[in-house]
Amino acid sequence: MINKTLNFTGLIFIILLFLYTSINYNSLPEKVPVHFDLYSNPDAWGYKKEIFILPIIILALWIFMYLLFKYYVKFENFKSTFENKTISKDAINFNRRFITILNFELSTLLSFMGIKDVYNATGGNIDIGIFQFVIILVVIFSTIILHLYKCYKHKYF
């Protein structure tokens, strides 16, 4: 149940990003920042149509991660036929949960980043500087490290 909730919630954030970007599209200037340095200062500008690149990338990433979640069992079964070993059902569920959590974190964090970019392009001012980069790295890598630790602890390798 938690997997479905997290997957659905991540998709909702992406849809909200598309809606927010579409609603504010007409109020965007012709040139908008499309790339930022480490401190969130714009270092590349593009046409306002390019503001949809980030939501499209986030949606493609979400679809890829969701398909990986959905077909993980088939992938594991295919892999185990070549390695002559089976993976436990607990390990499969644990890894599927990890994929779901990572998908949720990525879609949520990147959607908020996209909303911030649109808001700033329309004249707003949300400046969290390097903390945006740090937050994303800490959340993603702490999830990965925690997953690897639990895999090692439960001998899921």
Report residues per predicted region:
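Alpha-helical transmembrane segments and their helix-start/interface "positive-inside/aromatic belt" motifs
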Residues: 1-14, 51-55, 96
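Terminal transmembrane helical module of multi-pass membrane proteins
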Residues: 127-157
